[in-house]
């Protein structure tokens, strides 16, 4: 049987080009920011232009280009090969779609045969209104339009098990310690995640608690490899009060604790983007560390891709009602 898997992320322009950043910012404002911030309609174009311009200027000044979409492509190819090894009797096809970039999820779904099942795999560390629920809502709306024309099911898979993600992340960090011959009592481990609102304007799952559990689980596994384990949030500014401590405050605490060697790992992201890479870079250089190791995200790490494949395969043996994304 032919089976389809769609990896879904926000997407992100690869270059600082203002037109691309503007369109991306506009789509995020319409599809995400208004979920958490009651922004009047007339202000949306102004905010989109401001956000697009600020990203263009920052990326240009930092000579930065986002690897997110190219990484997602590599993840997709790796996952397809892992699925073929795991269940060779099926004909696996892994695709990539984005929430706020082309190809959009609905565009990809329209292109797939109506009689072939589809599993959608949101590439986020925690399930929240800003991650998996966006995909679920998109699929529900799309399915209502598709109606009876869609014979095979379309399912949005849950997030990876928290302890499993922590295991994979901790082993990834441990391998980096061994390869680089670093770590010990004079090193600090700094764990970074995307921030979220503490008091959203309406009840919603923010993913904060799940993210904190993953962070704590990584810390438990690696606490004896470092002199201290710290965590911080990469926050935005609009919409209200955000998660604490912000990364700036965390790094001040690390420095005040006497650490001069830092291993920085953005555990809350499954693929590198401007927030995991560029924001971390900017915050870290505000201090005169002796040594900084900025680890990439899990990206296409073989153990991580293998875990994704097992996740897809185990999900497929469950009853359809348990997995329905519509």
Spell out what each predicted region is.
Residues 1-326:
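Extended amphipathic ligand-handling, pore-lining, and cofactor/metal-binding catalytic surfaces
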């Amino acid at each position: 049987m032919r089976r389809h898997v769609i990896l879904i992320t926000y997407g992100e322009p690869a270059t600082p080009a203002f037109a691309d950043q503007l369109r991306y910012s506009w789509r995020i404002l319409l599809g995400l920011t208004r979920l958490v911030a009651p922004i009047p309609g007339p202000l949306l174009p102004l905010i989109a232009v401001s956000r697009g311009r600020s990203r263009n200027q920052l990326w240009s000044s930092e000579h930065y280009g986002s690897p997110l979409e190219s990484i997602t492509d590599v993840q997709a190819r790796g996952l397809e090969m892992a699925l073929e090894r795991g269940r060779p009797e099926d004909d696996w096809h892994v695709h990539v779609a984005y929430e706020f970039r082309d190809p959009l999820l609905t565009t990809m779904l329209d292109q797939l045969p109506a009689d072939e099942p589809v599993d959608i795999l949101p590439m986020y560390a925690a399930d929240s209104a800003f991650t998996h629920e966006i995909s679920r809502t998109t699929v529900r709306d799309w399915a209502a339009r598709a109606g009876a024309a869609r014979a095979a099911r379309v399912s949005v898979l849950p997030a990876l098990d928290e302890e499993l993600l922590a295991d994979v992340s901790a082993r990834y960090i441990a391998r980096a310690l061994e390869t680089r011959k670093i770590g010990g009592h004079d090193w600090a481990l700094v764990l970074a995640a995307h921030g979220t609102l503490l008091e959203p304007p309406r009840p919603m799952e923010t993913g904060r608690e799940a993210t904190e559990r993953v962070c704590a689980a990584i810390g438990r596994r690696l606490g004896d490899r470092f002199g201290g384990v710290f965590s911080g949030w990469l926050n935005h500014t609009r919409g209200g009060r955000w998660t604490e401590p912000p990364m700036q405050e965390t790094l001040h605490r690390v420095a005040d604790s006497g650490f001069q060697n830092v291993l920085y790992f953005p555990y809350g992201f499954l693929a590198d983007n401007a927030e995991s890479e560029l924001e971390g870079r900017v915050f870290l250089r505000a201090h005169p560390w002796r040594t900084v190791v900025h680890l990439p995200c899990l990206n296409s790490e073989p153990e991580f891709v293998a875990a994704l494949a097992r996740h897809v395969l185990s999900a497929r043996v469950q009853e359809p009602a348990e997995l329905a994304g519509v």
